[in-house]
Regions:
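Short, aromatic-enriched amphipathic alpha-helices that serve as compact interaction elements
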Residues: 55-73, 170-185
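Surface-exposed beta-loop interaction hotspot
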Residues: 152-189, 194-205
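Sec-dependent bacterial lipoprotein signal peptides
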Residues: 1-16
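Bacterial signal peptide processing site
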Residues: 17-22
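Short, well-ordered alpha-helical segments enriched in acidic and aromatic residues
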Residues: 62-69, 73-99, 187-201
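Surface-exposed, charged secondary-structure patches
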Residues: 83-87, 92-142, 201, 206-255
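Short beta-strand edge/turn micro-motifs at domain boundaries
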Residues: 138-167, 254-276
Length: 276
């Protein structure tokens, strides 16, 4: 059912799922752009547990869960010497020089970008054979990509590619989001009024649909990562230049928020928010 101007009070409480503690994102300024490939490598989460089950290669997300946590598994699933492109120049990494990389598992949230609502389900597509995980350094205008390919039923990391954000298919949206995520006044000016809203009843998980006035945005908005964000490309071509769907979720899948943006007359604006 539709509620106009005000969603029932219980919906407000449910937004807590989208609003955990505000986390401080690692400052990109402390990481030289050309050293990004080694900047996230630590052994904090690395383990030497037994080989994950074969089922871990079914979905990319299942594979990634183990890749980011298991040191032995990670090293086994990298094609060495690892191609490591930095602004087009290959600086290969030998197996002995590799440092365990937890990628985004240490983050309280990570983000994924799609060009429409339908493509959000691509993460569950078992036919996908090439996935690109990205770190997007908004403040420095840099992108680090991890290229994973599935060969003979197994996912492997084949290439790192660090380059200027200008080469990225989402460069226009990233430039917009850089300011949207940090400037409250800019946010308010780039939200359709009213905007669509959906949340779920915690008792029966029934959807609660409605619309909110832009003045209510500060009360409902999720904590949005800024400065440095992730993206996982499951094969999205981003051919729809007028729409982007940003999914903010936690590695544990304990929370998820979806923000839908549309571009009208060259200007991006938030049109819909969904909180799970």
């Amino acid at each position: 059912m539709k509620y106009y101007l005000m969603i029932v009070a219980s919906a407000i409480l449910m937004l807590c799922a989208c609003r955990g503690e505000k986390t401080e994102t690692a400052e990109a300024e402390t990481v030289p752009a050309d050293s990004v490939p080694d900047s996230l490598a630590t052994d904090i989460l690395g383990t030497d547990t037994a080989e994950p089950p074969v089922a871990a290669d079914g979905l990319f997300d299942d594979f990634m869960y183990n890749f980011m946590r298991n040191r032995k598994f990670q090293k086994k699933r990298i094609k060495f010497p690892l191609e490591n492109l930095v602004d087009g120049k290959n600086k290969p990494i030998a197996e002995g020089a590799w440092k365990f990389d937890p990628v985004y598992v240490r983050e309280e949230v990570y983000t994924m970008l799609f060009d429409d609502e339908k493509s959000v389900t691509s993460e569950k597509d078992t036919s996908v054979h090439h996935v690109i995980v990205e770190w997007v350094y908004l403040d420095k205008g840099r992108v680090k990509q991890y290229h994973f390919f599935k060969e003979k039923g197994q996912w492997r990391l084949f290439r790192l590619d660090t380059h200027n954000i200008g080469r990225n298919a989402n460069r226009d949206f990233f430039e917009f989001y850089k300011r949207f995520s940090t400037d409250p006044d800019f946010q308010m000016a780039h939200i359709v009024n009213p905007f669509e809203f959906r949340t779920y009843d915690s008792d029966n998980f029934q959807a609660i649909d409605g619309v909110l006035d832009v003045a209510q945005w500060p009360d409902f908005k999720p904590d949005m990562p800024s400065g440095r964000i992730t993206n996982i490309n499951y094969g999205q071509r981003y051919s729809n230049n007028g729409q982007r769907v940003l999914v903010i979720t936690s590695p544990s899948a304990g929370m998820s928020c979806t923000l839908s943006f549309r571009k009208h007359r060259g200007v991006w604006a938030l049109v819909r928010m969904e909180s799970i």
